[in-house]
């Protein structure tokens, strides 16, 4: 799969990981442009159906990022995300998407380099996996 064809949706917490994207940008760190960032107020607000809809709309992979444990602006949002991610990974496997197309990580506002490296890692992973199997199913329908 050509790197330019890869589409990744990235859910970013408003208070930390979105700030990490800003830090990466202001520091002029290089990372692939294959991501589409969706800012959410808290990673704990990310529902499984958001991730599934991203695949249904043509994403090849999904990144979910939030504050480190103990740093959540809303106290326990990242712990809620931990529980939801277990469900999301299970659903991805059961639906034939594959959990390897989804990654979640904790990125603070000061971790621009980690933001850029996480994006690069995900693009390389999706490049190796190829297009989402959901794309093929939708094309045949």
Curated annotation (Swiss-Prot):
Keywords: 2Fe-2S, Electron transport, Iron, Iron-sulfur, Metal-binding, Oxidoreductase, Transport. Its EC number is 1.12.99.-. The keyword 4Fe-4S does not apply. InterPro entries: MvhD/FlpD. Its cofactor is [2Fe-2S] cluster. Binds 1 [2Fe-2S] cluster. GO terms for molecular function: 2 iron, 2 sulfur cluster binding; metal ion binding; oxidoreductase activity. It is an enzyme of class 1 (oxidoreductase). Pfam families: FlpD. The F420-non-reducing hydrogenase is composed of three subunits; MvhA, MvhD and MvhG. It forms a complex with the heterodisulfide reductase (hdr). Belongs to the MvhD/VhuD family. Part of a complex that provides reducing equivalents for heterodisulfide reductase. MvhD may form the contact site to heterodisulfide reductase. This is F420-non-reducing hydrogenase iron-sulfur subunit D. The lineage of its organism: Archaea, Methanobacteriati, Methanobacteriota, Methanomada group, Methanobacteria. The gene is mvhD.
